[in-house]
Swiss-Prot record:
GO BP field: mitochondrion organization; protein transport
GO cellular component: cytoplasm; mitochondrion; SAM complex
Gene: mtx-2
Subcellular compartments: Mitochondrion outer membrane
Keyword Cell inner membrane: no
Identification of the protein by name: Metaxin-2 homolog
The family this protein is said to belong to: Belongs to the metaxin family.
Amino acid sequence: MSSSGVITQLVTDALSMNAAQDWEDVSLFTPYLNDQALMYDFADCLAVQTFLRMTSLPFNVRQRPNVDFISPDGVVPLLKINKTLITGFNAIVDFVHKKGVTLTSHLSETQVADMRANISMIEHLLTTVEKFVLWNHDETYDKVTKLRYGSVYHWPLSSVLPFVKRRKILEELSDKDWDTKTMDEVGEQADKVFRALSAQLGSQKYLTGDLPTEADALLFGHMYTLITVR
């Protein structure tokens, strides 16, 4: 097992042990949503808030300028329950599931598999589209990304940190063979996601019927962000 695999397993085991603790003094840490958070982070922060409200679990939102540096893996949002830290939509959903709270008890195994496939498609494909536009498209980076990401820092950090973050994201895109894609090709990928989700939704109220699941929370987070982004 690789070192990253060992670390992932250790974190998973720790969360499994900590899932038994009471749901008390719970805070959700996010970047400044109106001024700092980028599209994909805003979407995930909104998705987690939506999911937790669906489960009726109480929590407080705390906006901080340096959440991605506080986060153990740089992923936001960051859920803090007592001394336990959980980062990102999927990990937070899994942690809540381990506490016996789920939105999928009414679903069949096939529907649960479809729901997880939807989450994977949104997380891995749509989020990658958003990162490409924000960090790889020069005009968007100069006019939007750099300004928002650096808005909470003083110079020279306001220039240095966006540059460092851009280099990291571009490496991620390169690892996925997205670095050579055109904007038209990226748009086609986004259209693929929207068509697939639209076909599944059909005339239903939610993706899997009359009741919402975590996939609906995640979809809402991204769609609301895409529709309202300026």
